[in-house]
């Protein structure tokens, strides 16, 4: 209920174009913009930026 409104599940897709995704929760109050995190992409075996997908 309220949990899903404040902290929705978001998909983080790799900017390397591999199609690899992470799924996480984000706090809309603290991060109203699209989330960008630098995480490991096991397909290309490198750290790359992952952007929030809507």
Swiss-Prot record:
Pfam families membership: Ribosomal_L33
GO biological process entries: translation
A molecular function GO annotation: structural constituent of ribosome
Keyword Transmembrane: no
InterPro entries linked: Ribosomal_bL33, Ribosomal_bL33_CS, Ribosomal_bL33_sf, Ribosomal_zn-bd
Cellular component GO terms held in the UniProt record: cytosolic large ribosomal subunit
Keywords of this entry: Ribonucleoprotein, Ribosomal protein
Keyword Ribonucleoprotein among UniProt keywords: yes
Domain of life assignment: Bacteria
PANTHER family, per the entry: 54S RIBOSOMAL PROTEIN L39, MITOCHONDRIAL, LARGE RIBOSOMAL SUBUNIT PROTEIN BL33M
Recorded family membership: Belongs to the bacterial ribosomal protein bL33 family.
Protein name: Large ribosomal subunit protein bL33A
Source organism (scientific name): Mycolicibacterium paratuberculosis (strain ATCC BAA-968 / K-10)
Lineage of source species: Bacteria, Bacillati, Actinomycetota, Actinomycetes, Mycobacteriales
Gene: rpmG1
């Amino acid at each position: 209920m309220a949990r899903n409104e404040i902290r929705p599940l978001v998909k983080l897709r790799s900017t390397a174009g591999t199609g690899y995704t992470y799924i996480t929760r984000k706090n809309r109050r603290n991060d109203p913009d699209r989330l960008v995190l630098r995480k490991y992409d096991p397909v290309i075996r490198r750290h790359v930026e992952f952007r929030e997908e809507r």
